[in-house]
């Protein structure tokens, strides 16, 4: 906020708005050129979520035509009475998290990139649930699945051209194992906590090299697990060790 105020004070609103529009147009043009370097076609991927009651499918087809990329979730299972569902805009965000590092690593990350993408997400499904569908754990549920599918179809598309084949990657951090604990501590007080150890993440293998054991996730290449001392200070837990398994 203070930095924006200082920019307005130095350059004025008209100049900042003009520069902002220019940056959006620049990003749009650059991603258009990048998409046109890639072959037209349709790439598909699907994942299943194992929940009480069965396996539930999320289906994605990505169709690239000239400089437009359409994501189509037709075939995805209906929403559930469980909190893993996504609203439309959560799905949109999960799709774009891999788009920026995989397609736009050298392009300013702003709204201009999104202008060439289309989303088909049938209402009432896991990726576009109707209110009042529960969505409290969407981030570790369908958001993660959509993120994975986006990585898969983009990597298949990149793998279809010699120029960008080496940028294709397997899924990073394929699932969030969200472990929730509650009970009584040594003083008889109720506690509840969420363990984020699985958030350490892992890097998927590339076309020419192995993956990495601990590497965060593709839109955020940093491990985000809470440190052991913090968990021990606030919960009746003691860590004996932390190590990859």
Enumerate the language-model features and the residues they cover:
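Glycine/proline-enriched, intrinsically flexible loops and inter-domain linkers
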Residues: 1-245
